[in-house]
C-alpha cells in the first residue's frame, strides 16, 4: 500500500492506540485526533465512566506522544448532541430501543470526522474497530469473535467504508494488549468501556428521567388485561426486560414476567411470559442493501448476539426479513446486520417485528 496521509481517531483506549501505531509502522503520515463529544461536567471527573471523558483525552494524547505523531482534539459535541443524543432520547420516548454506537459510527466517526478529514487533505481515517476490510471495500468479521465489531459498522455506506481503515481486524484483543505493552503504551491494561459514553453514571433510566421528566402510566398483564402496577416513565423500560418491573408480586402461575410492548401514546408497559417475546419476522428501515431479489443469509440483531438463518427481500426503501428461528427480546430501534459467512451484506434499523 502506498504512503497515505492518515487521520487516526484515538479514543484514549488500547485499540485505537495500537491501530494508530500500526499505521505509523506501515509508513503512513499519521495524525492523531481525539473527539470531544460530551459537554457534561460529569465527564470531566477523574474516574468518570464512558468513552469520551477528560481522562480519555489525556490517555489519547499520551499515546500520541509515545508514537511521535501530531495530536489534536476536535470538538464535535454539538453535532453529537444533535445526531446521536437527541435521537437516542427521541427513540426511547417513542418506545424504541436504540443503539447509539451504530448511530455514532453512521453520523459522527464515518460522517462528520470523515468529511472534515477529507476536506483537510487526509486520505483515510484509521480506527481501532475489531473488523476487517478487504481492498474492494467488503466488510468482514474480526478474527476475534468475542470482540468482533462488524455489527456496529454494518450500516455504513460503501463510500464511508472506502475511506476507512481497520488495522486490528486480524488480531485478537489479547494480541492487541500484548503489543501495546511492548510499545510502552500506558493504556495496555486499560479496561474496555461497556457503557453508553454520554451516560456518565451508567444509569440510563435515571438519565432519561432527567431529560424527559415523569410520565406515569400502568403496567398491564398481556394475558389478563389486569393492571399490575404503575411506573413513572415507559422510556425507562426495554422490550425483553425482566428485572426492575416493580410489580411486587409474582404471576399466578409463578412464571417470570417480561416487558413485551411499550406504548408511548398511553404510557402503557405490557408484560407477559417469555414465550411472547419470540419473533420470526421483521421489517428494517434506513437500510444499506445493494442486492436484488430474495437473499438467503444470516441475521444478527444484537451487538454480541448470535446469528439466525434468514431470507431478506428488498421492498422499496425497506427490507422484509423472514427468520428460520425465532429471536427473543428484540426491539424496534435496534440494528439488524446480515452476513454471508463472515462477510457483511448490509443492514438497517428494525422498524417492526412480528411473531
Curated annotation (Swiss-Prot):
Record-linked SUPFAM superfamilies:
Adenine nucleotide alpha hydrolases-like
Q: Name one GO biological process term.
A: tRNA wobble position uridine thiolation
What are the recorded GO MF terms, alphabetically? ATP binding; tRNA binding; tRNA-uridine 2-sulfurtransferase activity
Site description Interaction with tRNA, residues in chain: 129, 334
The entry's keywords: ATP-binding, Cytoplasm, Disulfide bond, Nucleotide-binding, RNA-binding, Transferase, tRNA processing, tRNA-binding
Domain of life of the native organism: Bacteria
Region (Interaction with tRNA), start-end ranges:
147-149
Q: Give the UniProt entry's GO cellular component terms.
A: cytoplasm
Q: Where in the cell is it found?
A: Cytoplasm
Q: List the cysteine pairs that form cystine.
A: 104-197
Q: Name one Pfam family in it.
A: tRNA_Me_trans_M
This entry's Enzyme Commission designation comes to 2.8.1.13
Q: Where does this protein hold ATP?
A: 9-16, 35, 128
Which residues are catalytic?
104, 197
Main localization of the protein described in the UniProt heading:
cytoplasm
Known catalysed reaction(s)? S-sulfanyl-L-cysteinyl-[protein] + uridine(34) in tRNA + AH2 + ATP = 2-thiouridine(34) in tRNA + L-cysteinyl-[protein] + A + AMP + diphosphate + H(+)
Instruction: Relate the protein's function as given in its record.
Output: Catalyzes the 2-thiolation of uridine at the wobble position (U34) of tRNA, leading to the formation of s(2)U34.
Family per similarity comment = Belongs to the MnmA/TRMU family.
Under what name is this protein listed? tRNA-specific 2-thiouridylase MnmA
State the organism named in the record: Parafrankia sp. (strain EAN1pec)
Protein encoded by which gene: mnmA
Amino acid at each position: 500500500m502506498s504512503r497515505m496521509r492518515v487521520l487516526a481517531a484515538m479514543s484514549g483506549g488500547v485499540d485505537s492506540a495500537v491501530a494508530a501505531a500500526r499505521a505509523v509502522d506501515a509508513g503512513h503520515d499519521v495524525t492523531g485526533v481525539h473527539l470531544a463529544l460530551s459537554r457534561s461536567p460529569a465527564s470531566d471527573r477523574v474516574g468518570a465512566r464512558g468513552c469520551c471523558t477528560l481522562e480519555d483525552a489525556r490517555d489519547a494524547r499520551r499515546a500520541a506522544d509515545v508514537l511521535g505523531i501530531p495530536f489534536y482534539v476536535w470538538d464535535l459535541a454539538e453535532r453529537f448532541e444533535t445526531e446521536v443524543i437527541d435521537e437516542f432520547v427521541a427513540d426511547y420516548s417513542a418506545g424504541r430501543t436504540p443503539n447509539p454506537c451504530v448511530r455514532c459510527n453512521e453520523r459522527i466517526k464515518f460522517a462528520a470526522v470523515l468529511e472534515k478529514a477529507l476536506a483537510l487533505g487526509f486520505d483515510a481515517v484509521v480506527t481501532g474497530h475489531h473488523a476487517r476490510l478487504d481492498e474492494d471495500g467488503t466488510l468482514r468479521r474480526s478474527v476475534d469473535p468475542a470482540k468482533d465489531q462488524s455489527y456496529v459498522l454494518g450500516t455504513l455506506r460503501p463510500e464511508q467504508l472506502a475511506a476507512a481503515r481497520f488495522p486490528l481486524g486480524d488480531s485478537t484483543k489479547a494480541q492487541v494488549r500484548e503489543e501495546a505493552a511492548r510499545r510502552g503504551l500506558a493504556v495496555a491494561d486499560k479496561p474496555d468501556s461497556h457503557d453508553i459514553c454520554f451516560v456518565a453514571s451508567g444509569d440510563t433510566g435515571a438519565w432519561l428521567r432527567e431529560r424527559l421528566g415523569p410520565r406515569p402510566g400502568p403496567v398491564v398483564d398481556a394475558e389478563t388485561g389486569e393492571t399490575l402496577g404503575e411506573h413513572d416513565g415507559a422510556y425507562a423500560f426495554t422490550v425483553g426486560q425482566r428485572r426492575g418491573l416493580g410489580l411486587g408480586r409474582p404471576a399466578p402461575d409463578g412464571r417470570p414476567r417480561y416487558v413485551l410492548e411499550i406504548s408511548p401514546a398511553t404510557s402503557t408497559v405490557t408484560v407477559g411470559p417469555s414465550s411472547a417475546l419470540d419473533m420470526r419476522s421483521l421489517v428494517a428501515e434506513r437500510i444499506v442493501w445493494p442486492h436484488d431479489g430474495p437473499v438467503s443469509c444470516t441475521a444478527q440483531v444484537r451487538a454480541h448476539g448470535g446469528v439466525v438463518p434468514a431470507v431478506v427481500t428488498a421492498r422499496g426503501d425497506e427490507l422484509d426479513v423472514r427468520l428460520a428461528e425465532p429471536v427473543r427480546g428484540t426491539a424496534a430501534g435496534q440494528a439488524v446486520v446480515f452476513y454471508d459467512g463472515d462477510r457483511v451484506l448490509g443492514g438497517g434499523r428494525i422498524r417492526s417485528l412480528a411473531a
